[in-house]
Amino acid sequence: MGFLSAGGLWASLFRARISPIVETDEVLPLTLIDNIAAARNAILSEVIRFDQVLDVVKLRDGLTELIDKRGWRKLGGRLRLRPNGSLEIHVPREFTEERPAFRFTSQAFDIAIEEHALGSQLPKLSDGPSLQPGSTSVDKFNLIPDKPEKLDDYVYSDRPILALHVTSFTNSCIVTLTWSHVVFGARGIKELIAAWSKVLHGEQNVPLLLGTHQDVLAGIGTDGDKTAPFLLDPIKIKGLGLVRIIFGLLWEIWQHPTVETRALHLPKRFVSQLRQKCMEELGAFCREDPAPFISEGDVLEAWCSRFVAQARADEKPALVTNALDIKDRLTAPWSSRGEYLQNTGCCTWTPVQPETLLRSPLGELAYVIRRSIQELATDDQLRAQLRIFRSLGHTKMLPLFGNPNSRVISFSNWTKFNLFEVTNLGPAVISTSPSTRSDASTSPIGRPVYMHCEAAGDSRMLRNCFNVTGKDWDGSYWITAHLYPEDWTKLEEYMRQTQQHISD
């Protein structure tokens, strides 16, 4: 969701903008989920740190070889507007120096990363739960020339969908992939990095890229696809209720215009103990044998949601939203012959009352989130949700459900994609000698030691928002949090209290 500034509005009204069209380009469609407004307005960057020096030429050439393969040429396309305002991809018949498959840039510092004033502040492992510098600190020295900030930067230029930027030190390397969310999301970046890794290793089993010419979801959520009613329809926020919740968000933005991003490092032992405590609480609450299942992800969402509620110091209900990948949940004509590089994310909405949010055992709150996911992640409910997506088109915002007075708390959990494991750029490592490795490295050769995903542009709308990157090689969780500047001291105290509570 974003707002057009007054200056941007006048500029758009009085400046003719032309999207460059090359008649010989191959035109590829985007999919149902690709074209919804939430995806088309986001530019994402996956920032990956390695504790070895990588050969930038091998990285560039490997990615070039991948995009030249069948189906993968989609990534070398350009985004273009159709007459009805939806988007499509125009792929050059041949990639050249003037029209490359992707944008490539690099920079190098002739010092160790620990000697760099900002590089030394990058997130690192800690014995207990800790707050670390966020993406803003990385961006200050990981400067990407002409980095896209909005959809127009693609549509009104010949910019490729994908960009690769490499920042090198004498003992470390930061690899950044930037793309428009309109083309793919979390599952897509996983498939891209996995295939890139295979190419670098010289493997012949690089998967085909499927669904480039026809949406595998084309027949789902249509009039001919009979589905059950969407469970949350009776509590859809609309009319004056929608005005109220939007006004509440705008009021919060006016009161707290600044949002900061920090990284949370939660060690394996901390998360395991927290989940065990929640399971014990849930067992006492449900009195079932065995107690209902709750995952570490459920527990982390409950824990973060409770922090937001406590930090805001009010009795507002919450609407906890969660991005949900549908690839393994929805019955669709998915083919096993290859992979799909498209958006496969739907959403769950969990209305939570203040009593549960603030005062019930944390295990009970985690179970409320788990139960909501179970109810909304069925085949029938996902089909019903895709029917809603079709009705939205490319202009309308996603619906909200629950109490109009709610505070929205958002989550995106990428743990299931195992990004630390699928990323293997080993053949591009220049040297594995101690002199070219960071002293604190815990990752295998050619594997990441840290990563996060960030969104470009105005971050004021990304508030009370958490992206769970997943587990690293120590089994620790990395979470990117978007909160207020005054929240960090409160969060450190919250972590300390939690540590004491689960250790009792």
From Swiss-Prot:
Effect of deleting the gene: Leads to the loss of pyrichalasin H production, but still produces deacetylated pyrichalasin H.
This protein's record includes keyword Acyltransferase: yes
GO molecular function terms attached to this record: acyltransferase activity, transferring groups other than amino-acyl groups
Pathway: Mycotoxin biosynthesis
Keyword Transferase: yes
Signal peptide positions (record): 1-18
Keywords, in A-Z order: Acyltransferase, Glycoprotein, Signal, Transferase
Enzyme Commission number: 2.3.1.-
Active-site annotation: H181
Record: glycosylation sites: N84, N413, N467
Sequence similarity: Belongs to the plant acyltransferase family.
Biological role stated in the UniProt entry: Acetyltransferase; part of the gene cluster that mediates the biosynthesis of the mycotoxin pyrichalasin H, a tyrosine-derived cytochalasan that inhibits the growth of rice seedlings, but also inhibits lymphocyte capping and actin polymerization and alters cell morphology. Pyrichalasin H is indicated as the responsible agent for the genus-specific pathogenicity of M.grisea toward crabgrass. The first step in the pathway is catalyzed by the O-methyltransferase pyiA which methylates free tyrosine to generate the precursor O-methyltyrosine.
Protein name: Acetyltransferase pyiB
Organism, scientific name: Pyricularia grisea
